[in-house]
Structure formats: structure tokens, C-alpha cells
Amino acid sequence: MRPQGPAASPQRLRGLLLLLLLQLPAPSSASEIPKGKQKAQLRQREVVDLYNGMCLQGPAGVPGRDGSPGANGIPGTPGIPGRDGFKGEKGECLRESFEESWTPNYKQCSWSSLNYGIDLGKIAECTFTKMRSNSALRVLFSGSLRLKCRNACCQRWYFTFNGAECSGPLPIEAIIYLDQGSPEMNSTINIHRTSSVEGLCEGIGAGLVDVAIWVGTCSDYPKGDASTGWNSVSRIIIEELPK
């Protein structure tokens, strides 16, 4: 009987080897052993040689624990360039005021002592170069103003641009009103006080602009005795501003 493979039990194999060894005859010369027995002995020796020293497989061991994490690998090679993206939508053009950097543009005209005592008409003028048509003009008149009368009166100081008052959005003006005198209040007191007329005007085209300060009457009130720029510096300041 031959073993059926390495899966045979150790006890069975040891028993087979012992049986073969017991059947071996005592040593003698080859000439005295019949050929049939010689073949049987040779076959037994082959079986002994085949299984002698064989390591038999034992039962499976307990699964081992997880190993430590390995070291980081070397960096990979750069990938191939990606494909071009889809074409974007058409953008919108920015307005001129954002595309170009804004350059300050201003001017000042001043007079040391106007001493202008007219009650109606132009007081002073300053010519300005406006660079853009979509900008606004900031104007300022600063100087002493006075109004005197015995009865109630009113005077108005206002700006004009190329001979017309501002219409974008409204006129730029300042008024002084003086009430009728009384025994307690002497309205003939002569007071000169530094005041200002200031505002923004839009809708004026680019180019030369004649900016002037005028004095006139108020609606529904008589004029009085007006004075502008007495004994002090008067000035007109003009500045172009982005809208």
C-alpha cells in the first residue's frame, strides 16, 4: 500500500516504515538472494528512501498582526497637460470713469479786497477748463457779505455757468434776509460777515466754462443795500469731480 499524499497522518507513515523494516532479511551476498526477493527488497528500500526524513505539514498557525505602515514613496512624475477649457462668455465694457485713472482738476481765483457795493449784477468771474462731459463741477465762493435796510429786505447771491444758472439739479445760491426795524432792534446796523455759497452742478459739457458769482433780489421781497468782499480776501474755487 502507498501513501496517498502528504496529507497522510504521521502515525500511519511511521507504522508503514516499521513494517517495511521488519520484512527486510538478514544481510547476505547478492548471489544467494533470488531475483524476485532482490526486486522486493529494492522496492522496499525505495519506499524507505522516499519517506525517510520527510517533514510533515502541521496544523495552520494563528494569523499574524498587522505590520507597521511603510515609508512614503518617492514623488510621482508630473502628469500630462490637461485639455483647454470651454470658451468663456463675453464680458461687458467698463465705463470710461473706471477705465481711465482720474486726474485732479481744480482752479482758484481770489481777490484781496473786492469792496463791491452793487445790489444787482455780476460780482466776480473765474474761467475753468472742464476735461470730461460726464463729470460734475463743485463751486465755492467765500467772502464777506452784508445787507442793510430800514424795512424788510432780502438779497440773493448765486452762481452762473456760461451765463446760466445751474439746472442739474438746482441753482446754487445763498440769501440774506433782514426784517423791518423796531425801537428795540435798529436794522441800520452795518454788519459785514464772511459767508460762503457752495454746491455741485451736473450736465455741463467739456471745455471752457465761465463761472461767475452774482447778487440779485429774492422773490416777493424788495432789495436792500448789499455789499460783497469788504476789507477781506474773496475767492472762487472750482473742482471737477467724477460722477
Swiss-Prot record:
Signal peptide (UniProt feature, chain positions): 1-30
Tissues in which the UniProt entry reports expression: Isoform 1 is expressed in calcified atherosclerotic plaque and chondrocyte-like cells.
GO biological process, alphabetically ordered: cochlea morphogenesis; cyclooxygenase pathway; establishment of planar polarity involved in neural tube closure; inner ear receptor cell stereocilium organization; negative regulation of canonical Wnt signaling pathway; ossification involved in bone remodeling; osteoblast differentiation; osteoblast proliferation
Gene Ontology CC entries for this record: collagen trimer; collagen-containing extracellular matrix; cytoplasm; extracellular region; extracellular space; neuron projection; sarcoplasm
Keyword set, alphabetical order: Collagen, Extracellular matrix, Glycoprotein, Secreted, Signal
Glycosylation sites: N186
Disease: Barrett esophagus: A condition characterized by a metaplastic change in which normal esophageal squamous epithelium is replaced by a columnar and intestinal-type epithelium. Patients with Barrett esophagus have an increased risk of esophageal adenocarcinoma. The main cause of Barrett esophagus is gastroesophageal reflux. The retrograde movement of acid and bile salts from the stomach into the esophagus causes prolonged injury to the esophageal epithelium and induces chronic esophagitis, which in turn is believed to trigger the pathologic changes.
Entry function: May act as a negative regulator of collagen matrix deposition.
Listed name of the protein: Collagen triple helix repeat-containing protein 1
Record lineage: Eukaryota, Metazoa, Chordata, Craniata, Vertebrata
Gene field: CTHRC1
